[in-house]
Design a protein with these regions (language model features):
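Active-site beta-strand->loop->alpha-helix modules in alpha/beta enzyme cores, enriched
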Residues: 1-12, 16-191
């Protein structure tokens, strides 16, 4: 005591949905808590949310900077979402970036509220299997497992909490669980 803990969250909200009270209690008891968001969760963000944030960004930039780069990018994204987007096609990288950024900031706020004091205890893994821009995801790969292994060897946790809803309709929770289990299996002979 205190213990070093990693909470693995498949999406940037599963940590507080699945174990928010425990998360808060671990921090309250002064354990060294890390949270690892395995995917960006970007496709769960609606287009209207992106438009709202882009309008905010555009207006702030117009007020406080003469550089037009960010303002123009925000306007480009707004125009695309309102007039050009074709349902069923993969999202544009800029839109995915905005959606992922919205989820990251929501996750950071939730982690801080739960008691994490330092941003270096909040990890965004962005596992590659998820980043297709579509509901359908890629299969788990060695690249995904390597990212989880690196976090485990960097943090060297005493305890881990892993969300693994095997009934997840899109399979993301299952794939994320399998990434952690595969990484643990590959590291089982390591000592820390």
């Amino acid at each position: 005591y205190p213990k070093k803990v990693i909470i693995f969250s498949p999406h940037p909200d599963d940590d507080v949905i699945s174990m928010g009270g425990t998360f808060h209690r671990l921090c309250e008891q002064h354990h060294d808590v890390h949270v690892a968001y395995e995917t960006s969760g970007n496709i769960a963000v609606g287009d209207e949310e992106v438009i709202r944030y882009c309008e905010y960004l555009r207006d702030v930039c117009a007020k406080y900077t003469e550089d037009e780069t960010v303002k123009k990018k925000a306007e480009e994204i707004i125009h695309f979402l309102r007039y050009e987007k074709v349902e069923g096609e993969a999202e544009k990288r800029d839109v995915l970036f905005m959606k992922g950024t919205i989820r990251r900031e929501e996750a950071r706020a939730g982690a801080r509220y739960s008691g994490i004091k330092s941003d270096d205890h909040i990890h965004f893994l962005d596992l590659p299997f998820y980043e297709t821009g579509l509901v359908k995801k890629n299969d788990l790969s060695e690249a995904d497992i390597a990212i989880v292994k690196k976090l485990l060897t960097d943090v060297k946790p005493d305890e881990m909490f892993v969300a693994g809803d095997l009934a997840d309709p899109h399979g993301t929770h299952r794939v994320c669980l399998n990434a952690v289990l595969a990484a643990i299996d590959e590291l089982k002979d390591e000592e820390w």
